[in-house]
Amino acid sequence: MSQKLKVVTIGGGSSYTPELLEGFIKRYHELPVSELWLVDVEGGKPKLDIIFDLCQRMIDNAGVPMKLYKTLDRREALKDADFVTTQLRVGQLPARELDERIPLSHGYLGQETNGAGGLFKGLRTIPVIFDIVKDVEELCPNAWVINFTNPAGMVTEAVYRHTGFKRFIGVCNIPIGMKMFIRDVLMLKDSDDLSIDLFGLNHMVFIKDVLINGKSRFAELLDGVASGQLKASSVKNIFDLPFSEGLIRSLNLLPCSYLLYYFKQKEMLAIEMGEYYKGGARAQVVQKVEKQLFELYKNPELKVKPKELEQRGGAYYSDAACEVINAIYNDKQAEHYVNIPHHGQIDNIPADWAVEMTCKLGRDGATPHPRITHFDDKVMGLIHTIKGFEIAASNAALSGEFNDVLLALNLSPLVHSDRDAELLAREMILAHEKWLPNFADCIAELKKAH
């Protein structure tokens, strides 16, 4: 790493950026970021300007010697960067609303990282991430790209499957939330060493063991969650329903809250349909929260991250991002839960898959934790199904072909009819036209047929 530490945040006008900056300020003594560049696109400029002003006030208030820059020119920012964080949303929140509302209008779950909605977020995002990777390879080839952009698993799979770039790590806040839940319910002290055996795919992870100071307390934790005495960890954008005792005991694993979309599909769909018919979707809630946040951010007296940001649903985002960068920069060999290719360490899945699992993180990036060599056979059917969906989705994002989109939709367990898959594909490709430039030929054909 260079003497100066330059971090570039793509999607710098995001409402999450103050949390990221707060994380850098808190860790400045061991992670001395000298330059932070905030990059956005023309459509995000008004938000970028507000975020930049707030971040400058936060830096001045903290008294750290960090230089802050803003630009719409990604290439200008990337030159000689050490770390690049990606937190972009192609099409911004209006595109997310389409991802949620169109599937719901056909009677299917509408969610930005699963099913039809997750597919179309991936189709919009993957080509943009590939463009960023190309720029990184040219302008800062030794930089690490730390990706927070959803769907993180699909994006990581696409980068490793279709590019030669190897310094890419997909990060999610869900495992951090699970870790904080465990610390809380087991009443651990800061000095207690907590190690978690976590495995699966992004937004489809399971915990199979929890070690406190080297001793397993998983049975106690599982029993508490199964019996309902311990309330399992959830996130802001998912309705809080408990998994049944029978499911938890039969799995003998702790599933993350996103698995509600698979194990409680009927209940989750009923709740979402109820919200939809009342005229609401999660994207609309988020847009209201965002509007309020940016009004707060404009206040020239505000010099710290406001507490209201926690309503946005990105809890522990800062800890996840900053600690990953910290572990690499300082060669900490610390335990993290990230998306990477496992390179054959897991003996019962293909060697080239990107997975989300417990890893050791240091100067050379992330390596799978030596303790985890086998994914639990009980959930391998579901994992294989979703990985097939991710691979098909990443292929479709590159090809721009209607039939590749159709294949991905038909492989998703959240789409139950081949006829509906075709209707969804047509409607969603046309709805997202301006954000799917590599589907231009496909869109022209669809319009002609229409």
Swiss-Prot record:
GO terms for molecular function: 6-phospho-beta-glucosidase activity; identical protein binding; metal ion binding; oxidoreductase activity, acting on the CH-OH group of donors, NAD or NADP as acceptor. It is an enzyme of class 3 (hydrolase). The active site is at Y258. Substrate binds at R96, N150. One of its GO terms (biological process) is diacetylchitobiose catabolic process. Homotetramer. This is 6-phospho-beta-glucosidase.
